[in-house]
Amino acid sequence: MGEKKIVVVQLSGGNDYLNCVIPYDNPHYVDNRPNVRITEDRVIPIGDGLGFNPVMSLIKDLYDQGKVAVIHGVGYPEPNRSHFRSMDIWHTAEPTKVGNEGWLGNAINQMYPKHDNVVAAVNFGAGLPRALVSHGAPVASVTDLNTYGLMNHVSELDQRNEALQAFKDMYSQAIGSGPVMDYLSQTGLDALKGAEIIGGVTDKYSSDVEYAENSFAKSMKGAAQILQADIGTRICYTQHGSFDAHTNGIALQEGLLTDVSGGIYDFYDDMKRANKSDDVIMFVFTEFGRRVKDNGNGTDHGSGGVAFVIGDQVDGGQY
């Protein structure tokens, strides 16, 4: 068995806990959701009066194999129901104060205190989630692995190499000019090195798994490509949404959960076929659940939500 890796999936906007893992025969659920309720005939039962959303059949397959842990009622004290503050808490693991560093960024620095792994973490999407932010923690943000890299628009190899060398020289010469320039220059060099490493992973990837044509599936395929390449990446991060279903609640959530369930299943299948699944777990979370009572055809911000941990090394079941 090799180094352990984690793929973090953020369901942005507040995934509706009660329509994801459904207490379908609970009278409080039935009475409070006359309009935004999944009826018993559509639910995929998992026992104890609970069932998965009807579009989560692929997650149910993994659940039946003992690969899925369902973690109920996940939240934090004195919930404020704000998207922004809730995400801050999830990203920093600081429920009582505003934190500056992310829990995954801190984990990177603990694993690599010398900052010598420039591809320790990869975020799929624009920007950088606060969860991955920590002083000195190297993180690459990728929107498309097929086009990722520097100077890819320069077709002539010699010209491209000359341009890259110019950047390396520029950053290298600034080191030793003071702490600020040292930090900026080292960050630049790390970015160049990381882009060179990550830019080559698609050439090494071969798989028969056919991912769906949506942004989440694309990110999960990218995570599989990165992790199967064994370049040293320990953390992959992606997000999907928005699950903020104040209106059109059932249709919106089911469309997004279809993407998520398919992407997770295909990623697991891909890693399994490559004999890499033993070393990887997936952690799926959302900032909060939705209120028990519907608001007509949607739901408003709630508190406790549901999280999932998925993988070969997971002791599946309900927690």
Residue ranges of model-derived segments:
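Feature for exported/extracytoplasmic and membrane-associated proteins, marking the mature portion
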Residues: M1-A274, V309-I310, V314-Y319
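Metal-dependent active-site segment of extracytoplasmic phospho-/sulfohydrolases and closely related
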Residues: I264, M271-G296, H301
